[in-house]
Structure formats: structure tokens, C-alpha cells
Amino acid sequence: MVARNLYELLEHAALDPQDNKISVYNPGNVDQVGKSLTYADLLNTAKTNALLLPQVKGIRPDSVILLHFDNHFDAIVWFWSVIAAGYVPAISTPFTNDPEGRKKHLIHLKTLLKDPVIITQESLAKAFSIVDGLNTHTIESIQKFDAPHILNGVHATAKQHDDLAVLMLTSGSSGNAKAVCLRHGQLLQSIAGKSTHHGISKSDVFLNWIGLDHVANLTETHLQAMQHAAPQFHVQASDLLVDPLILLKLIDRHRITVTFAPNFFIASVRVALEHPEPFLHGKEPDLTCFRIMISGGEANVVEASQALTTLFQKYGVSSEFIRPGFGMTETCAGSIYSRECPSYDVSNKWEFASLGTCIPGLQMRISSDSGEILSMNQVGNLELFGPILFHEYYNNPVATAEAFTADHWFRTGDHASIDGNGRLSLAGRAKETIIVNGVKYFPHELETAIEDALIPGLTPSYTVVFPHRPKNSQTEAVCVVYLPSYEPEDVLARVGVADAISKISIMQTGVKPFQIIPLDKTLLPKSSLGKLSRAKTRAAFEAGKYEVFQKLNDDAIHAYRATQNQAPSNETEATILHVFADLFEIPEADIGVNTSLFEMGVSSIEIIKFKQRIQTELKLKVEIPVITMLTNPTIRGLAGTLETLMGPQVYSPKVTLQAEGKKTPLWLVHPGVGEVLVFLNLAKFIVDRPIHALRARGFDGEPFFEDIAEVVSTYHQAIKEEQPEGPYAIAGYSYGSMLAFEVSKVLEANGDKVEFLGVFNLPPHIKFRMRQLDWVEVLLNLSYFLDLMTEEEAHRISPEMHELSNSLGNDKVLDYILERAPRERMHEMALDRKKMSTWADLAYRMQAIAQDYDPSGRVRNMDIFYAIPLVAVAKSKKEWVDNHLVKWRGFVDEEPHWHEVDGAHYTMLGPDNIHTFQKTLRASLEERGL
């Protein structure tokens, strides 16, 4: 029987006698499957959850359900739960790192999806709090509902071919996401067409590592496997990207026949296999089962495909297996594939692989800009037609109209040609995007971030970011050109701008730019509207018109770095330098111990790789915290810190978050939890001055501070040792504001000038709040400060935790929290039970020594940054300012400068608000003459 809709597809799979499973690996563990369920199990679970969904507050029969998860298992279960209940799921894409973009994205989705019901997990719910009025619910809260005996509302089995099945989001990293309407019949025809094209049957076994928010998972793997009731395995992308050889081990272990891999990952697997003895510490994989590797998202390099095919043949693959394809969300993922890679491409001597022919249900053509249909081998606009195509963008008639020609063919936005054998080849994209390692970025977002950084030496409004694919490269690269404001011979300024742009690019895209070129103003002409042409800039670069400027810049920076490079002075430095050179594939002679990770263009994946390699090479018995890598980016700095880690711990409060820049250093004092991690995001944006943070004593077994006087004395001494002379700039976050105030008084009493004293959302009188915080409350505050739970959850369980503490002790409270904490977050923070317990004790001690604190004395000036207050202390910003913060006036000679900032007390420095906060902070420093 042929399924009429997705629900029937699952029903049919559940009846299959082989009882095959969907198996999911937990994040961080690829040694054994974490969770699995048969198709029958999935159907039963979905039906059970479907009984609960109509009870969700605000849900309507026509509601869109926006699903947001960070793991495969929950995403799959709740996707089918929504389908079973008869609603339309919209699968949320991962949030961007750009706070402003993320907020804009959520506000846009609220309108686009007509006030959707949002379902997520408790550990992710906090991300939605930045936008008012969102109807957000957690799966943990929904599962506590009482289930009725019958399901009211729309029955999933009643859905027809033309009914809307799911909404998939496109361009999720910008504020103009579109929701693609995928229909039941469209999806079913698509997976049938894929299977026919590739010869897939129920004997196949699927492996996926892409999120369900991407059609490369939903249709290419999940639904296609379900169509055949075939086994499917899901692993986290982060686990494969750290060690690409895990792919081969999983293929061997589960006898995988079908998987997906973009070109950048093919290149990573190739590099790993070309290492001498890649499986030195384990058995070689048996790949005789493997036959299909779907590849899409970016152009496939023929040379890399040929190399990987040869390498896989050593492990038993008998034929060509890479299937380069073309697809979009609008076409249910891949819809045009080559089955002759690399042989067809090698015979034609092509650099990039052909994309082959259409699957059943799709036609393609090439047209000119005027609408003329072009003949073979002519480059033009790729257009598609057929029943597997979408019909519309949800709630967006303008975009829908623009997407189709007058005769209803879909405009893909790609330039392409079709050869004499009917094979498709892409020639580029009409749309302005950059695809780096399979991930799409928008040039204007990186341009904005660079401009907002106010980099010394860079002229505002003359920065252009564009994509470029270097010859033989496996992926596109980022290029940046700018107008310098420094003199050509000012090498320090030249290097400073390059490093600042690199740092911002790494933060935004995860990679260092391929080229950063300062240009003459004559090469950056603006239109009558004051715009720079990205297309013309890219064309000029690729035509070689910037080569003179590029060579001059590269030579100057290379010569400067060569004079600055220093040789290793001990074995630890030499080992780290060797790992550094090997990982980034650069000669050891070209780097020194003062070379920074940020100069190399690190991504988070490469930081983890670097960390793991160092731990192995140095045979470390302790885990290197990620913060250690981020705050000690040079080889010498990291070596010194690691030697400290390996030897007796000597406490120093100073943690340098940013060492570069000539402006007055900024000192940041920790909040009540004692740690300085909260300042990392802020330090990324400030490239023109050193940033030092002050960290509490006791994290590494030292005695906790006895009183505030000892804290102030210790921090004052640390500041004077690093910066003997003023002027000084000091700021504190929350509890740290009190300490910054006290340190400033000591500095001024000794004749030093404190030109800037920043108070981040703290009033002068705090002892009443300090007395409210017992150990349990401190632990709960710490837990949501570390994103181990949401603030709402901490408040909700507080009474229960206090009862648990009173009856069984604090250890049981800690057990409760750690059992429910996200594993990935614990691993990222290098947290274990002992560290968490110590941290809670330290934070409680910091609160305790302030229980009798009364402010006294005066400082010359103060800048007060205020956000939404804690519910426990004030009901509104107005009440917070008028009744609490205003009392600082009694302790300052001049009227304080007031700065209203976005977010709430615990989120004002978070990723969602840091972009606007840093602008306000930098402007206030400038206003104070710093």
C-alpha cells in the first residue's frame, strides 16, 4: 500500500517485520549508541505525545509548531509527535553567533509563522527570552500533562498529498528567513525519486550527521530510510568533524551503505587517510558494504573526489561511490545527481564535478536574463520544474512571486550549463553568499561587524567582504578589502588592522580570511548612493587588479612577523609549536612562540583538535579547559599556563583576555560567582586596548578570601603590578561592581587617576540581597549563570531543592542538578562534580563576606550600565533606577553617566546582547577620554 502522507509512511515502517531501528549516538560519545527505538516505538511515542499537544497553552488547530533542539533524538521524536497530532512542524535552524542577527531572526519568525507555538528543551529555552511575547514551551513541561484517552482535533491520517506537511527555514542566519512549504505528496515523490535514481532498497543502512533542520537529514536520510523501513544511525556533527576517521569506523561497525558528506568533509577525510598509518591504534575498517556518499552544499573538487575514491578502494569499496548533487530546501534536498564521479569528470578534464541528471519528478533548463531558453553548454540561469518542487513560501507572497517565472519554473538563483549528455554543471551563484565548509554566511554581516569594531587604521564605510574560491581549494574563502587610514610605512598599524579583521572573521565565520588587502581609495569607488559594489570588487580581485597592493601588504606583514618570531625556550614550547605547525600545515620556521592562534584562523573544532593533540603529546593527566586555550592564544602563553597546570598551583587574580592595543587597559572584576568567563564575549569585540579580568581565589584549591579588605588589597596589587601608572579604567559586573568601587577608592587615595569606573547593574547597598542567598540559592544561580539550566527552571525548583537540602543535605541538591545538566555544556566547561562543588562553595563564600557590607567614601566619577533587574529586587527598570541605582549619587563627586543597555541582569553580557553592550561601553570609554 502506498502512503498518502507522512504519518502513513511511519505507520507502514512500523509494521515492517524486520523491526529495524533508528539509533542515535549521544553528543561526545561515538563508542556506543546512546538511544535507539524501532519504527513501531517511534510511532507509539509520537501517538502518546500527540495526546498531550492540544493541551499546550495558546495552541490552535492551524498553529505552526516551531521545534528547536540541539540533538537528533528529541528532534526526531517531537517532529513525529507534531505530525501525529495533525499540526504543521517548522524546524528551527541553529541560532547565529551574531546577537543582533539572532534577535532579529526570532522577531521575524514570530511574524512570519503567525505567532507559532515554540517547543524546545529546558536547557535551550533561555535563548528565546530575548524576545517578548513568544509562546515557548519545553518538552519537560509538556510531558507532565495528563493524557486524555482520545485525540481531539485534526487527525494525521486525514492529510492528503497537497496538504502542508512541514515548514523548513532558509537563510536562518539572517533576519529574512523564508519558510519553505513542503507538502506530503511532494516529500513522498521526492524520496521515491531519490531511491529510484540511486537504486536504494530496504537492504540499505543509512548514516546521518546533519541536523533535522536541514533537508539533507530530513529527506535525504531520515524519510528515505523510513520509506524502506531501513536502519538509520545518527551521530553529532561535532564528533565527526573533530575526527573524520570516525566516519569510516561507523561505516564498518554498522555496515553503512549510504551517507552524506559535503566537499569540505570529503577533503578532511582524505587528509586524515593520507597520514602515515591512519589506523595505527586500531583495526583498519572494512568498507566492502559502502556504496553511496551523497555530496552537496558546495562544488565538489574532482581531484579530491578522485583521491578519496582511490583511498576508499584500499579498504574494500569496489566502485565509484561519491554522488555530487544539486538540491535546495525548495526541492526537498538533492534532486539532480551524478552517478559517474569522478570518471566522467576526469574524462572531461574538469576541475569541479558534474552534478549529473534529474531524478524522476524534476526537469531543468537554462535561460538567459531576458528569458530565452539556452542551448547546451551555454551558461545561464538554472530553472527547475516538476511535482517535487515547492509551490510557495509560507506567509510570503512577494518572495513566492519572485521565485517563479511566468510559466511557473522555479528560479534557483544559480548560474549553470547543461552539456551534450544532459549533465548539469554549476558556474556560480547569482546570490551574494559565502559558503565556507558547507555553511552559508552573508558578506554584509561580516562587513557590519568589522565596521562596528571601529578598528584603528581602518576608514569607516570602505570595507568590502566577498567570496573567492582559490584554485584547488576544497571550499570557498573569505576575502576582505578596506581603505587604510594609516601611512603606508606604518607596519604596526597595518598588522593591527589585519589581526583585528582576522579575529572578527573567526568570531563570525570560524575562519580567517584568505586575503585582507588595504587598497587605494581610487580602487574603492562608491555609487551615487554611496554604495560599494561587491560584485565589481570581486571581479577586480579575480582579474588580478589588486595584486600589487596584495604583495606589498603580504611582504610587509611577513617581514614584520619574521622579526618578531622567537624560538622555543623549553621542551613544552617546542612540543606545542610542533603541534601548531602540523595542525595548520605551515613550516615551523615561519612561526614563533609568540604566534597566536588567532593569526592562524582557528575554528572551535580546530581548538578542540589542538587541545586534544597537546594533551596527547605532553601526556597531560589533567584536562585543559577551553578557556585556557582562548585566553592564552600564543604558544608561549599556553606553555606557561600548562606548566602551571602540571605543577603546584600559584594563585594570580589576573587573566588577560586581550593583550593587543595601545589604549588604556580595561580591568574587569568578576561577578559573585568569582569566574571571568562572562567577559570572553566582550573581549572579542574590543581590539584597541588590553583587557584584563580579575578572578577570585579558590578555584584551584587555594583558601577562599576571608573578607572584602583582602579581596581589594589583592586586586589592587595585581593591577599595580601589571599597570604601574594610570589613568585607570575599571568595571565590575554585578557583585564585581562593589569590588571595582572599593579598588578605585584605594587607587584614588594613593594619588592615582581612575578615569573610568563602570558599574554593571548593581546598587551600592547589597547586604540585604547577600543575606537572601544560602548555599542552595547560590548553586542554582551558578547553574543558570553557566547555562546548565534556565533562570525560570532555577526559580521553579528552588523550593524543592531547599526541601531536599534540609532532609538529605547539599550533596543531593548537587546530584540533582548534575544529573540534568547538558553533557555537552559540562564537557565544554570542563566541569565535573568536584569542580562544581568547589565553585559553589567559592561563590557562597564571596556572598557571605558581603553580608555586612556598607558602602562608604567617594570616587570622582562613575558610569552606570543598567538592565532589567532581578525579580527579587525590583519590578521594573524605572523602580530599579529610582529606588536603588540612584543611591550611587551619594558616593560620587560628579553626576554619574547613565547607560541603559539591552537584556536582563544575567543576560546583559550574553551573546544576545553583547553586540549592543560593547558599543555602549566603548562609547563611554571614548567619552571619558580613554
Curated annotation (Swiss-Prot):
SMART domains: PKS_PP
SUPFAM superfamilies for the chain: Acetyl-CoA synthetase-like, ACP-like, alpha/beta-Hydrolases
Coiled-coil stretches noted in the UniProt entry, renumbered to this chain: none
Assigned EC number: 2.3.1.-
Reactions the enzyme catalyzes: 2 3-phenylpyruvate + 2 ATP = polyporic acid + 2 AMP + 2 diphosphate + H(+)
InterPro entries xref list: AB_hydrolase_fold, ACP-like_sf, AMP-bd_C_sf, AMP-binding_CS, AMP-dep_synth/lig_dom, ANL_N_sf, PKS_PP-bd, PP-bd_ACP
First-level EC class: transferase
Key word Zinc present: no
Function: Nonribosomal peptide synthetase that mediates the biosynthesis of polyporic acid via the condensation of 2 phenylpyruvate units. Polyporic acid is further hydroxylaed by the cytochrome P450 monooxygenase MO6277 into less toxic ascocorynin.
Protein name, per record: Nonribosomal peptide synthetase acyN
